[in-house]
UniProtKB/Swiss-Prot annotation:
Natural source organism: Pseudotsuga menziesii (Douglas-fir)
Name of the protein: Large ribosomal subunit protein P2
GO CC terms of this entry: ribonucleoprotein complex; ribosome
Keyword Ligase set for record: no
Assembly description: P1 and P2 exist as dimers at the large ribosomal subunit.
Alphabetically ordered keywords of this record: Phosphoprotein, Ribonucleoprotein, Ribosomal protein
Role according to the record: Plays an important role in the elongation step of protein synthesis.
UniProt keyword annotation of Hydrolase present: no
Family per record: Belongs to the eukaryotic ribosomal protein P1/P2 family.
Record PTM text: Phosphorylated.
């Protein structure tokens, strides 16, 4: 899933 990737970029 990509949700973790965008969350890591916060």
């Amino acid at each position: 899933d990509i949700t973790e990737v965008i969350a890591a970029g916060r």
